[in-house]
Regions:
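Short, conserved beta-turn/loop elements at beta-strand boundaries and strand-helix junctions
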Residues: 118-125, 283, 384-390
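Charged- and aromatic-enriched interaction segments used to assemble
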Residues: 127-255
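Conserved hydrophobic positions within beta-strands
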Residues: 116, 278, 380-382
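Juxtamembrane "anchor/assembly" segments of surface/extracellular structural proteins
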Residues: 1-93, 131-140, 305-408
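Surface-exposed cap/loop segments at beta↔alpha junctions
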Residues: 64, 69-178, 195-196
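Extracytoplasmic/secreted envelope proteins and their assembly/folding machinery
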Residues: 113, 157-161, 204-207, 275, ...
Length: 408
């Protein structure tokens, strides 16, 4: 994955001087008079959740001295088909498809396609009335029922492909309402995973978490009207330029005092342990299973530069957990996963940089100029992109996952 310095990015984006956004409702750009009323646009994503957006709109018309979008309508006017009634219904939560783009003049990126879900007007005692409209990625419509399920010895794309075939035990209907398309080339390069569990999750939320874990994307691909029998489907796989509103697969390099506006890391040893033991039961032999993973194992390379500090803090020697595992290999892999998850929580950070539409949850970022303990490679868990009165900024939360920690 290429590493991009923000000075090079600045040249491509004309110095980040002209941020721009675009809102389309049912395929049409919002009218210019509505566009001028948009005070702020925000997009949020999280590596475990469906992404969302928020618009803050001026809700006062000084020419008529009345509310513009919410607050002046009548039950009768809402049933009419006039320009005024259409404006009153413009931001109603419903099935209208909304496309949000953000970026810079000449280079806008699709952040999401979604639906309005919430209207929140503000009628203050002083100051201008505003309307805040929130929405979710169109994928939220696929949240139907939560399931518990598990796969053994499968690749992520195989899991996605199989999920599309599963049926609900009570209704007999397919659990997932759309066919799922995977990338066969990506499948051939994926590692086989011994055990993956869906734990009381919506299928779409489970798929999103698996996709972001691998740096993949998920999107709804509309039916091709030129192809007979073509149908709407869900794509699970790597971003492909020209096929989807894709993002560049890049790692940004951000340096304190140059490209980082602020950076607030937290280092904690409170919940760290030296080893994890997983107990299970071998159904074939009828014997108990016990496997252990330790930080002394050579495979634990993330944040290894902090292990010396951890040893001085005398972390708990061990945690023992009972897990639904049935082979020694499953128990070993589960112990490794638990210990690795603990290890990743040692250093977390929140930060702000200039607006970067390609900086998303599930991607990596290199932090430099903050010393040996806090410089390094971070995995982004959440981002918030905002275009408003202060220009375009991207705020993100991340956890340090440095391989050796050589950066300073």
């Amino acid at each position: 994955m290429p590493v991009v310095d923000l000075f090079a990015e600045s040249r491509d984006q004309r110095g980040f001087y002209a941020p721009q956004f675009e809102i389309r409702i049912r395929g049409a750009q919002i009218p210019n008079d509505v566009l001028r009323d948009v005070v702020e646009v925000t997009y949020k994503d999280n590596w475990k959740e469906i992404d969302s957006f928020e618009l803050t709109v001026n809700n006062w018309d000084p020419s008529t001295n009345s509310f513009k979008y919410v607050g002046a309508e009548t039950a009768e006017s809402l049933q009419q088909d006039t320009s005024e009634s259409r404006r009153h219904r413009l931001f109603e939560p419903c099935n209208k498809e909304v496309e949000v783009k953000m970026g810079y003049v000449g280079d806008l990126k699709v952040m999401l396609t979604g639906n309005f879900t919430t209207m929140e007007p503000n009628f203050p005692s002083s100051g201008a009335p505003t309307l805040t409209v929130r929405g979710l990625n169109i994928l939220h419509q696929l949240r139907r029922k939560q399931y518990v399920y598990a796969w053994e010895n499968k690749r992520d794309s195989e899991i996605a492909d199989n999920l599309a075939t599963l049926r609900d035990r009570e209704t007999g209907q397919k659990r997932f309402p759309l066919p799922i398309e995977i990338d066969q080339n990506a499948l051939s390069t994926e590692p086989q995973i011994d055990y993956v569990a869906e734990q009381n999750q919506y299928d779409i939320d489970f798929l999103l978490a698996r996709a972001r874990q691998r740096g993949y994307v998920i999107f709804i691909q509309e039916a091709d009207p030129q192809v007979r029998g073509s149908q709407r489907r869900l794509y699970f796989g790597p971003s492909q330029e020209g096929r989807i509103p894709g993002l560049r697969d890049v790692t940004f390099k951000l340096e304190w005092g140059k490209s980082l506006i602020d950076f607030k890391p937290t280092l904690t040893t409170a919940n760290q342990v030296r080893s994890v033991t997983v107990n299970g039961w071998n159904r074939r032999t009828g014997r108990p299973i016990q496997e252990r993973a330790s930080l002394d194992d050579r495979e634990f390379t993330r944040n290894r530069d902090l292990f010396e500090l951890l040893q001085r803090c005398d972390p708990r020697e061990e945690i023992v957990v009972e897990e639904p595992v049935f082979t020694p290999r499953q128990a070993r892999d589960r112990a490794r996963a638990i210990l690795m998850d603990r290890q990743k929580e040692m250093v977390k950070a929140s930060a702000t940089t200039v607006g970067l539409p390609d900086l998303r949850a599930g991607k990596l970022v290199q932090i430099e100029g903050l010393g040996a303990r806090f410089s390094g490679t971070y995995f982004i868990t959440e981002t918030t992109h905002t275009i408003g009165g202060n220009g375009y900024t991207t705020r993100f939360n991340a956890r340090r996952e440095d391989q050796g920690g050589q950066s300073t």
